[in-house]
């Protein structure tokens, strides 16, 4: 019997990536072959994103393209999974009846059954990586208990559910056996890890246990400013293989807007938290995300945000314009700002951040730092420092002369120039072996 072949397109965030990797491992165990070209596949499976409007549009466009391939006889089946069917399954079934089946975010056994495979719980820790082999994501929880008024994630992903700590350690061991050296911890909210199962945070315990496993870099993404366990910052300071980096989306600083967003935090709370983090670990680099143009945001409130960003000097910052999300509570609010005005505010904030980032990056000039090589061409290596998460942060563009470098290896680099989003320099030597995480 010919082997069934599957082309999987994973859209959206790193949490989706992990879901796709789990599915591919289960499929491989059932002798379903994963292919990289659509024209080699029997089935196209699209893992969709529905977080913002642009993501929804991309998901729809990819579905239509897949259906074209089915009509042309290139593939036999098209399946769609993930966040978009979780919100719009009935509408999608009516509008796109040629799709063979739609699946939500918690239907892995049903997806496998449609592919002619059986879900095997003993393979939960197994993943076929879609990332480069030297880094991977470790999803430490599912769902979200926060009630942010602009967000539909709780409706898409359900209530917060921490993954068992020992299970995460087994999964991390599997990843290490596959050659992963950089582990990026992710969730909708890492701050609450363990609260639902033990009544207290287990994030620091998890970090310590992972640090003992001798990963070269361990990185924390998607912290929430409420309930964040500050002992984690002490561990970050004391353990050399835990990156001095924290991604903590703050969204805004104005108290009225924070209340309307239902963030559960004030500007004063936020300033105290950031100050405490920097006091405990002076080497920490902070990434955040801001949402501008929330319904009712005045020019004065936006300028307060500009002042806040200038004062706090975030190392990395992303910014999005507010858009009504159909299943989010804030969709009931009157949205008076034009798209053009929101985009102008995004540009203004990012222009300010450019100046901040340029200033902070100049501090690296003349210094040696550790980097990982993600890729290289001719005599230019594209690298990241411990302060840069994959895909979203800065790059280090480094020459390496006659050295024989390898993608996925770690090196010492001398920085001699910088811009807002890049560091420039040269690779000096390979990272010395045997560095202890203690």
Swiss-Prot record:
One BP annotation, GO: tRNA modification
Q: Which cofactor does it need?
A: [4Fe-4S] cluster
What's in the keyword line of the UniProt record?
4Fe-4S, Cytoplasm, Iron, Iron-sulfur, Metal-binding, S-adenosyl-L-methionine, Transferase
Q: Which residues form the TRAM domain?
A: 362-429
Q: Keyword check for Cytoplasm, yes or no.
A: yes
| Residue ranges occupied by any MTTase N-terminal domain in the UniProt entry | 4-120
Q: Record's family? A: Belongs to the methylthiotransferase family. RimO subfamily.
Protein's recorded name: Ribosomal protein uS12 methylthiotransferase RimO
Q: Which organism is it from?
A: Chlorobium chlorochromatii (strain CaD3)
Supply the source organism's classification: Bacteria, Pseudomonadati, Chlorobiota, Chlorobiia, Chlorobiales
Identify the gene encoding this protein.
rimO
